[in-house]
């Protein structure tokens, strides 16, 4: 399985970079995983609704440019479906079973994802009803993907 994590914004925090590097190393035994960082759209504070839409649309274009037609896209969004780790593992396993060898997880910038990215997504996933920093979501997502592979192989880790 080829997994891409496409996210808006450059990661600056060293501790997050270290955690991400660790999970990428662990995941290399199970899948080809790449993290694609795309620049965020520079925007002043106190944007109007129309300006927010423009920012999301510009970031959305960058995201969509990185997704091929045969990729199964999972948008990370607060309004997405919440799953347990076991349910998430089953859904990843099903994708592999049904020949979906390319999977992209999409993480928007601080304003979220554009409507075009949401339309292109095959599903939407939420890790919590709480708002989490989009930089932190990369690490949380990689940990859950790793956990899913361990669960699916019956390997210890997930308890």
Curated annotation (Swiss-Prot):
Its EC number is 2.1.1.177. Gene3D superfamilies: 3.40.1280.10. CDD domains: RlmH-like. It is found in: Cytoplasm. GO terms for cellular component: cytoplasm. It holds the Pfam family SPOUT_MTase. It is an enzyme of class 2 (transferase). S-adenosyl-L-methionine binds at residues 76, 108, 127-132. Keywords: Cytoplasm, Methyltransferase, rRNA processing, S-adenosyl-L-methionine, Transferase. It comes from the Bacteria. The keyword Methyltransferase applies. GO terms for molecular function: rRNA (pseudouridine-N3-)-methyltransferase activity. It catalyses: pseudouridine(1915) in 23S rRNA + S-adenosyl-L-methionine = N(3)-methylpseudouridine(1915) in 23S rRNA + S-adenosyl-L-homocysteine + H(+). Homodimer. Belongs to the RNA methyltransferase RlmH family. Specifically methylates the pseudouridine at position 1915 (m3Psi1915) in 23S rRNA. HAMAP family: 23SrRNA_methyltr_H (MF_00658). This is Ribosomal RNA large subunit methyltransferase H. The lineage of its organism: Bacteria, Bacillati, Bacillota, Bacilli, Bacillales.
């Amino acid at each position: 399985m080829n997994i891409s994590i496409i996210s808006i914004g450059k990661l600056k925090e060293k501790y997050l970079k270290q955690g991400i590097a660790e999970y990428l190393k662990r995941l290399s035994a199970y899948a080809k995983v790449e993290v694609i960082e795309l620049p965020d759209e520079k925007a002043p504070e106190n944007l109007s609704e129309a300006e927010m839409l423009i920012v999301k649309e510009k970031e959305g274009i960058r995201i969509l440019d990185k997704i091929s037609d045969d990729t199964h896209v999972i948008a990370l969004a607060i309004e997405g479906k919440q799953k347990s780790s076991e349910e998430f593992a089953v859904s990843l396993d099903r994708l592999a079973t049904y020949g979906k060898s390319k999977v992209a997880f999409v993480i928007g910038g601080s304003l979220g994802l554009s409507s075009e990215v949401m339309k292109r997504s095959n599903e939407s996933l939420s890790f919590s009803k709480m708002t989490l920093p989009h930089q932190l979501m990369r690490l949380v997502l990689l940990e859950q993907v790793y956990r899913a592979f361990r669960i699916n192989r019956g390997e210890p880790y997930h308890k």
